[in-house]
Amino acid sequence: MKKWNQIIIDRSNKITKVNKPKNFKDFSEEMGGYDVNEYFKSKKSFFEFYFHGRYVIWSNYLKSSINPFTKTLSIASGNGINELDLISNNFNIICSDLEIPQCYEELKKLFGHFDYLKLNILKDIISIEFDNIYSISVCYIFSDQNLEKFFINVHKMLKKNGILILDSGGGEDNLTSFFFIDIYLVIEAYLIYYLSKIFNKKIGFKFDNNFGYKRKNREIKKFAKKFGFEFIDIKEYDYLTELQRSILIRKIIEYFPFSKKVFVSLGKMIPYIRMFKFKKI
């Protein structure tokens, strides 16, 4: 495991360092907010705005991995993009998060009643036993100590032979990600910042020292095994998201679309989506 620091280019015209721990509001803002907006007018407008890109990848994987007639708990559901797609396809999904989002009541008007629980997976345990539990793009924020708590509590809430699906929430900790994220992106950010001063542009960046953690595949498997899970398989998807953290790469793809295939090939070394499937033993 290694600390994952993120750089975000913005229009602040300064370099900002962020060290504070994140709360539910921070995560909500990172995901675009959970408030009701103009896209809550209908199911169609909701899905057209929110359900695309990696959300489609996640939903397709979940549909192929979960029996719709079994009971499934979603950890950190947010505004329920994947969950509502599954519910619309007759899956039995119970949502949960640190707080129930403000948009919950409005979503029930669109999609009908569905359960949403206030749940801190690091502290709380539900008395209900589930056939499946899944967690999408969450475990990257957990320290080793918190990841242990996560596996312990999930194990208690799963039936015997129950399935845990875990998305890592970012590329693997390897040499490629180290050179790209910890070296190249930092150099690129400083170059853009100082060049913006020469050309009198208001460009700055935020250096988030508390973004999360990166882990090797074998580290996640080791944690799961330690706390009573058998590894079934891993599927990897989305080979561009990590690389597109670079402004230069985004511009190259924009102006030279044929280059996308090259970057997809390179991105296979740091896939953004890593779907782990485990069974409780």
Region roles according to the model:
Residues M1-I66, F69-G78, I165-I192:
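Conserved class I S-adenosyl-L-methionine
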Residues N79-L122:
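Class I SAM-dependent methyltransferase SAM/SAH-binding core
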Residues Y134:
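A conserved beta-strand element that flanks and buttresses the S-adenosyl-L-methionine
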Residues E148-K160:
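A short glycine-rich, Lys/Arg-flanked "PGG" loop and its adjoining helix->strand segment in the class I
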Residues I203-E219:
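Acceptor-substrate binding/catalytic loop of class I
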Residues R218, K222, I232-I281:
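A C-terminal cap/extension of S-adenosyl-L-methionine-dependent methyltransferases
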